[in-house]
């Protein structure tokens, strides 16, 4: 039973392994290949990208916002498309009234500036003449009760006005310097922005060539992994079939052991039976002689004692088992002659070694196909090879370069003039801001000296020169204000007119898209300024659409009008290349015929066991004889009984003969019966072993032979199915490397090499340079300077008024004065009454 159970377990494992192998062979599991490598490609795009320009947030942002809101109030009219069209195409057709109507807000500001320019210097001239004739200014004539309140109010108003002037002039200084600092770099950034677009089209073929050359990275990776594909295939076959092969080989080995043991027991059984039969032939006459003599002796009348009991024992002295009655096994031994012919242990070990060597065997068998695959991988797909040659950018590149060169050459003189005039503006701005600052200082010094003089006026020992000096400082500030009022208002209006129109006409319309709409409308731009033609845009794409598409990362060939249509996906189509690799992979084959599983000698042994009829032997017949004693009567007990009877006899001759018989029985038992009993025990062991294994042995042998035959027949199909699955996994893995390359090329070309995004970036940077870097500080400067200019008027008024109170007051008697001025009261003499 133990052998049977030990054999059934591998057979059950074999059945389960066969089912699992079929499932594993039908399913594609690519985990055994491990994770794919991540390829690292070298960027091929040149560094022509400009960093996006953004004005850093600062304290002046709120000032810039205030100026923009002020300009939006000044200019309420929409973008003057017709007026700009006339200015660009036919300057003589421009009507003045249309310009005035559009610039109505600026005209109002010009009127205000004109009035300021006329009235303030005129007032200053009149004030100067009046002062020369001592008609204006001067000092307070008389002291009255409200004098202190008036003086304090004027001083407070003058101080507040001066502080407002100080704030304005500080902001004017800061914005003037900021404008000057940003004007130079901004002007230099314009050519830099144009140069960044120079190679936008012309550099594309060289960069595409560099991209195509990096196809070698996936090629090298695939070629490297092809070196191990044979081992991978063999390992996969080994892994998926070992659940079937190992149990089957274990079952074959176990069955071989059972076969060897069974044949040994059968041979032992046959030899033992022969010996037992021969022993019985020798034992039977001897027992019969002893029985006859004992019957004769025990039946004599001279026999004394329990002769009757001994006589009954002697009558049963005969053979118990008759081994001539057991069935013959000669025909079975004849069938198993020479079995086992094979060494099952070494055969199973050899088959296991052959099965475990499948990876190396597969590598050897696939080496020639792998070399052909490497040759196929080394070839470059036609689309990738012509990636750069197919880009039709020569004519577009020359047209693009010519347009950029014309723009750069035409703009360079203007930029130089702008930079030169900016220097003049900065110098004039610094001078005028310094004048305003000097006015502020005069006001502050005048106020300080005046207050000091007022505090010392009650002390007769202190002269009133301090108050007089304070008044003179205030009048000096007034004189400077009148003197520089005209240059200030002229600078303010000139910078206001330029900067305001740049902001409202260009920057504002640029931000809301009206400038793009104007450029896209046919006929608005002269032929020499046709941007669509200069940029080489497609006919069905407007400038605004091109800008939006470029901002979203569109490719050049979707925006520019190239010679031929360029289809990147067509060049990246490597299906023909991969199909060839797939065909080459399908030619991979692994021969598993070297795995016999069962040698011919072992098969003959199992077939002989199967047809031997070992299970048809009637083993109960053997057990019947084995269970019987060799001699029915216990010869030792009978001999002991005879020994006692011999001693009880009076007749010495009878007693002597009984002793001789007792000793004879003992000798016969030791010489014949005991060996027979040993042979019976040996026979019992073999019969029991064969009885337990023989009934199922034929079925087990049939199952093993059937499983070996089935697995041997299905092994090539299973191996081919596993090979196909492994090939598909390997192909998918290798195609993943080419997919990485295609994805990288698509991203590199569309987002970095052949993208028109630098064009939108250049436009955005140009807007930031013009509007945020130049126009905002420029407009903030004139706004702050205008602040100072208009606050000079209240400064003049309050300074003139306040200076009067800082000069000494002329004291004189008055008839209407109070009694404090009447030092003496002399009573008049009246008439006396007696």
From Swiss-Prot:
Organism: Homo sapiens (Human)
Tissues showing expression: Present in saliva within small membrane particles (at protein level). Expressed in kidney, prostate, trachea, esophagus, salivary gland, thyroid gland, mammary gland adrenal gland, placenta, stomach, spinal cord and liver. In submucosal tumor, expressed in spindle-shaped or stellate stromal cells. Expressed in prostate cancer cell lines.
Membrane topology: Multi-pass membrane protein
Lineage, uppermost ranks: Eukaryota, Metazoa, Chordata, Craniata, Vertebrata
GO molecular function, one term: cholesterol binding
Ranges per topology, Extracellular: 27-106, 175-426, 494-779
Protein name stated in the entry: Prominin-2
Keyword check for Signal: yes
Subunit structure: Binds cholesterol.
Record's signal peptide: 1-26
Keyword Transmembrane among record annotations: yes
